[in-house]
UniProtKB/Swiss-Prot annotation:
Originating species: Bacillus subtilis (strain 168)
First-listed, main subcellular location of the protein, grouped into a coarse class: membrane
Protein name: Uncharacterized glycosyltransferase YkcC
Highest taxon of source: Bacteria
Assigned protein family: Belongs to the glycosyltransferase 2 family. GtrB subfamily.
Signal peptide segment: none
Subcellular location(s) of the protein: Cell membrane
Length: 323
């Protein structure tokens, strides 16, 4: 059955009742142009609105619509991972439900795939309808990731991309409890290329990636693919120790060889507060890594599916190959 489906379109959904019908219509119009078999795999990530009801209505009419319904909100990256677990196509496309990423670009991705590329990712050349603050924080996010991680993650890319079946299969072998999908796709390698596009403003609803979630995603990406924060913590410790010893020698020299002495508590308190802040920052960095090690050690399931619609293989590929 799996090889009879050429394309799987994975769509994570969280509170998208205002746009989900339009998303389905545009995806259907685009994929019908391929003249090949496809599936639209929606992953409902614990939506609290009518998203699941609207999706169910479409699945009853169109058998190509398949739904994974989480027991609660597990997060965008995990929803993408679940979609890849259940996808049956020879090529898998990940696209958000908010229509900021144009479904029409999928056809260009498919052409690149047919040319032999195994990963085709979309690069944003412009972002419509976003505030100056949002654009600047997004730019900082991508450049921070690029500078701090040990792999080459393309700048100004999201999770909108096409992956060959063998890329998806390799992704399923990874056991990350805090998956950072775009980083993992870069890590597995294979022949990759880019297509450029202008990102549209939201059709309706609110962004699902406010600053707080962007910071968490950035931390997940950095801690997953880099030891640089730990190295920076070590360098900071060396710098603090060196500064402390230098200050000690200055105080001793002034006391033993001159008539001058350093008086006043203000300078000492400032130095102590500065060093204490750096120590706490270092402990926080170490804590982030320890927390992720703890998540991996618990070995809990990545997500829980309370119900699925149109899915024939009820047992996860991940469970079949990881046991």
């Amino acid at each position: 059955m799996s090889r009879h489906i050429q394309y799987s379109i994975v769509v994570p959904v969280y509170n998208e009742e205002l746009v989900i019908h339009e998303t389905y219509q545009r995806l259907k119009e685009v994929m019908d142009q391929t003249k090949e078999n496809y599936e639209l795999l929606f992953v409902n990530d614990g939506s609290k609105d009518r998203s699941i009801e609207i999706l169910r209505e479409h699945s009853l009419i169109d058998p190509r619509v398949k739904i994974i319904d989480f027991s609660r909100n597990f997060g965008h990256q995990i929803a993408i991972t679940a979609g890849m677990d259940y996808a049956q196509g020879n090529a898998i496309v990940v696209i958000d439900a908010d229509l900021q990423d144009p479904p029409e670009l999928i056809l260009e991705m498919i052409e690149k795939w047919k040319e032999g590329y195994e990963v085709v990712y979309a690069v944003r050349t412009k972002r419509k309808g976003e505030t100056f603050f949002k654009k600047q924080t997004a730019a900082m996010f991508y450049r921070l990731l690029s500078g701090m991680t040990d792999i080459d993650i393309p700048i100004d890319t999201g999770d909108f991309r096409l992956m060959d079946r063998k890329v998806c299969d390799e992704m399923k072998r990874l056991k990350e409890k805090n998956p950072f999908v775009r980083g993992l796709v870069s890590w597995v390698g294979f022949k990759q290329t880019a297509v450029e596009y202008v990102r549209d403003e939201r059709l309706a609803g609110e962004t699902k990636y406010p600053l707080k979630k962007m910071l968490k995603l950035s931390m997940d990406g950095i801690t997953t693919f880099s030891h640089k924060p730990l190295k920076l913590a070590s360098y900071a410790g060396i710098l603090m120790s060196g500064t402390g010893f230098l200050y000690m020698f200055i105080v001793l020299y002034l006391k033993l060889f001159t008539d001058s002495t350093i008086t006043g508590w203000s300078s000492l308190i400032v130095i102590q507060l500065l060093f204490s802040g750096i120590v706490l920052l270092i402990l926080g960095v170490i804590g982030e890594y320890i927390g992720r090690i703890y998540d991996e050690a618990k070995d809990r399931p990545l997500y829980i599916v309370q119900k699925s619609y149109g899915i024939e293989n009820k047992r996860l590929y991940r469970d079949q190959h990881m046991s």
